[in-house]
Regions:
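Catalytic beta-strand/loop cores that center a nucleophilic Ser/Cys/Thr
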Residues: 126, 131-133, 230, 260-384
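Extracellular ligand-binding/catalytic regions of CAZymes and related secreted enzymes
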Residues: 19-25, 31-62, 242, 341-419
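Alpha-helical scaffolding within the catalytic cores
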Residues: 96-101, 145-147, 354-358
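N-terminal signal peptide c-region/cleavage motif recognized by signal peptidases
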Residues: 13-15
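Sec-dependent signal peptide recognition
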Residues: 1-9
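Helical hinge/lid and interdomain linker segments adjacent to catalytic or ligand-binding clefts
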Residues: 21-31, 61-62, 67-71, 121-229, ...
Length: 419
């Protein structure tokens, strides 16, 4: 109850009128869930305090009432409700009740966001860049030069998407080796590696992966999707081992390299086998894409786990949504073989048809990481060269909401997980 009374005092300090703006996040009341995150970020950036009401109407946001906040909601098409002091207190009292699986989390400051992305145009979209732009949440693109010069120290949150940290150029060789974009990307990567003082792209990418690892250990938050998940772990575990075939680095791979993989260096995965064939569009058996061929598109959904908001606020924040059942989507790394997920990594979303892990979270040092399988939550089978998803057509996307949960998560006042 002491927490409840503190929150009441905290909220009454917002304005003399003691009224508040609620951004409802349930399925029927909010017309643009994605931009609601942007409004909340905008408020934090302007030094307003905000509260995230976990499991209350889909994970709603409580903001101070100010004319500029109402105006911004109207401009961006975000549904909001104006509450009196008494109404806000009643909601907080309901949330504070021990019988309710709800919690109030105070958001204190807008996190500084970096997106790891190359300077040139890629022949595929990046779901996180798309949704950050759509939600009007500012971010800074960074790449290898910035990472290797300790540029990550300037940020709280780092996103990685369709990346390959193993030096195998995304395993695109079989289908795209003669295409102009593949040839150009390979040349650019080699030029950059040489410029930065590395003999091979794989060595340079490993150095980048290690800087990202150190960023997390030091307290940073890393969010990765698609092939940035498993290729990152593989690169760390294969340090000092040549796993690249001649078409990638000019010489043969190391004999018996599988037996030399050090799984203890990986963040999330264990006991996996690497895919040696350069013509197979796969890094290892971590990915479920080829193992799940019997799951048709119309049945491809994953279920978000339910956590105790009061006792486990971290996974609760990361799983806030207006539905527990989220539409699946493919990627180079679609989902993770649950048998290969380390026991200290939390599975937050799984496909109940085959038990695969889709959405996982863990701690490393003082920091945290979240891995999310798949490429684009609103494009079931996004292909190379496909146009970017138009998010105006998907303003209430549950899959994109999961990405934005991760964006706002570093803004939360830290409270240690109790279980």
């Amino acid at each position: 109850m002491r927490l409840f009374y503190f929150l009441v005092l905290f909220l009454t300090a917002f304005s003399a009128k003691a009224s508040f703006v609620l951004l409802p996040m349930d399925e029927t009341s909010q017309q643009n869930h994605l931009k609601a995150y942007g409004i909340t970020f905008w408020c934090l950036d302007k030094q307003y305090k905000a509260s995230w009401l976990l499991n209350y109407r889909g994970g709603s946001f409580l903001l101070p009432d100010a004319p500029e906040i109402r105006k911004e909601c109207q401009i961006r098409g975000v549904s909001f409700e104006v509450l009196s002091d008494a109404e806000a207190n009643q909601i907080l009292e309901e949330i504070a009740s021990p019988s309710q699986n709800m919690e109030t989390v105070i958001l204190e400051k807008a996190p500084k966001i970096a997106v790891y992305t190359p300077k040139g145009k890629q022949p595929w979209d990046d779901a996180v860049t798309l949704v950050l732009t759509y939600a009007e949440i500012p971010f800074t693109p960074i790449y290898d030069e910035e990472v290797l010069s300790d540029g990550l120290l300037l940020y709280d949150w780092l996103h990685l998407h369709h990346e390959d940290f193993t030096g195998q150029y995304g395993k695109f060789y079989a289908n795209y080796k003669n295409t102009p974009w593949y040839i150009e990307q390979k040349k650019d990567a080699e030029t950059l590696a040489t410029k930065l003082g590395y003999a091979k792209v794989a060595e340079e990418k490993l150095a980048v992966a290690k800087k990202i690892r150190d960023f997390v250990i030091g307290g940073g938050f890393m969010f990765a999707m698609c092939s940035a998940t498993d290729s990152f772990d593989i690169a760390l575990a294969a340090e000092g081992i040549d796993i690249c075939e001649p078409m990638f680095d000019g010489d043969a791979s190391e004999a018996n390299y599988q037996s030399k993989i050090d799984y203890s260096q990986s963040f999330a995965f264990k006991d996996y086998f690497l895919e040696r064939n350069p013509n197979v569009y796969e890094f290892s058996d971590i990915d479920m894409t080829q193992k799940r061929a019997n799951i048709p598109m119309e049945k491809d959904y994953f279920t978000l786990m339910e956590f105790s908001a009061k006792w486990d606020p971290i996974p609760s924040m990361l799983c806030q949504n207006h539905t527990q059942l989220v539409k699946g989507f493919m990627g180079q790394t679609t989902a993770f073989d649950r048998e290969l997920v380390k026991t200290n990594v939390l599975v937050m979303g799984e496909c109940q048809l085959n038990g695969e892990a889709r959405y996982i979270h863990g701690e490393k040092g003082k920091g945290m990481f979240t891995f999310f399988g798949g490429h684009d939550p609103e494009d079931f089978r996004h292909q190379v060269g496909d146009p970017p998803t138009v998010l105006d057509l998907h303003p209430t996307s549950p899959g994109y909401r999961l990405i934005l949960n991760n964006v706002l998560f570093p803004a939360a006042r830290k409270k240690k997980q109790k279980t």
